[in-house]
């Protein structure tokens, strides 16, 4: 079960509810959000019809909860905001781009497991 309320999503996993903040990006807030963040931002370029995108959603939700205050997790729907996807040369989804200090610093294409994602994000997370 998933209910979206602004930037707060509630996910139901194995009988418990986990809440975390996942930022929804649009053309109106993308540049300001990326440019003004003190934290690294992992942007998930996704679409509603994309099976692998749906498969990694719970993984991103877990990371958002576990790494709160260390990294921001954000999502951008490529069907709604294709201009931004084109700007960052997103050709396949899911594409995950880590923005650090306003710049695209790392790109991952395809569904990733939690361990692999955390390994890829380690250089951006405080120790």
Predicted stretch roles:
Residues 1-17:
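Short, Lys/Arg-enriched N-terminal segments with co-localized hydrophobic residues
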Residues 22-41:
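A short beta-strand-turn-helix
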Residues 26, 46, 72-74:
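Conserved Rossmann-like nucleotide-binding pocket used by diverse enzymes
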Residues 38-39, 45-49, 92:
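Short pre-active-site segment immediately N-terminal to redox-active cysteine/selenocysteine motifs
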Residues 38-40, 55-76:
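Conserved helix-turn-beta segment immediately C-terminal to the redox Cys motif
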Residues 45-59:
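Conserved redox-active cysteine motifs that mediate thiol-disulfide chemistry
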Residues 78-85:
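Structural microenvironment flanking redox-active thiols in thiol-disulfide oxidoreductases
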Residues 97-127:
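Non-catalytic, surface beta->alpha helical segment in thiol-disulfide oxidoreductase systems
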